[in-house]
């Protein structure tokens, strides 16, 4: 009889609370969280989607090169853009305000580059995917903009807003993956993990209740 193979441990190459929460929603608990410290500056004339997938790959490959054990590394990078203009990950009140003003009454796109690397016996297998979601905000008043900025929830967020927070009240239209906007497209993540031999509850018999990551 063929024995079930134990899942490799999962390493999340990010300390993002949103990505940790999203993995927990699908019952994946990383055995390690190792943020990848890379330069996230866009290259000259680099477009949003290529930037997101490049940064995700650089994060994943950096962690893969640092570890000795076999594991599956999950990395992602989220970029918000209006047209070809990449919005910053806001670090100040003014940056948040400028981003929200730009998003007010307009459609923008959120791109998440996903890179999952399976490292086993020093062999690397890579899965990459870019996922796009279109989001439209209603026209915001100055009062709404100032109030949102006062919450500080847009700090360190792509495009200066936290979609799973108060900014959700601004959305008049969304097309695509909601989890993608939060920072990790779950449908594509599960598909990639499955293709790498990781057993996930969403596609396995009911008796398997969790996506167990070996520790």
Swiss-Prot record:
Gene Ontology CC annotations of this record: cytoplasm
Chief location bin = cytoplasm
**Pfam family for this entry, one:** Maf
Q: What is its EC number?
A: 3.6.1.9
Reaction(s) the record says it catalyses: a ribonucleoside 5'-triphosphate + H2O = a ribonucleoside 5'-phosphate + diphosphate + H(+); a 2'-deoxyribonucleoside 5'-triphosphate + H2O = a 2'-deoxyribonucleoside 5'-phosphate + diphosphate + H(+)
Alphabetically, the GO molecular function entries are: nucleoside triphosphate diphosphatase activity
Could you list this entry's UniProt keywords, alphabetically sorted: Cytoplasm, Hydrolase, Nucleotide metabolism
Q: Which cofactors is this protein said to need?
A: a divalent metal cation
Biological process GO annotation list? nucleotide metabolic process
Q: What InterPro entries does the record point to? A: ITPase-like_fam (IPR029001), Maf-like (IPR003697)
Q: Where is the active site?
A: 77
Tell me which CDD domains the record gives: Maf
Compartmental location: Cytoplasm
Q: What class of enzyme is it?
A: hydrolase
**Entry's PANTHER family?**
BIFUNCTIONAL DTTP/UTP PYROPHOSPHATASE/METHYLTRANSFERASE PROTEIN-RELATED (PTHR43213), BIFUNCTIONAL DTTP_UTP PYROPHOSPHATASE_METHYLTRANSFERASE PROTEIN-RELATED (PTHR43213:SF5)
What does the record give as the function of this protein?
A: Nucleoside triphosphate pyrophosphatase. May have a dual role in cell division arrest and in preventing the incorporation of modified nucleotides into cellular nucleic acids.
The record's listing under HAMAP family reads: Maf
Q: List the protein's name.
A: Nucleoside triphosphate pyrophosphatase
Q: Which species does the entry assign this protein to? A: Rickettsia rickettsii (strain Sheila Smith)
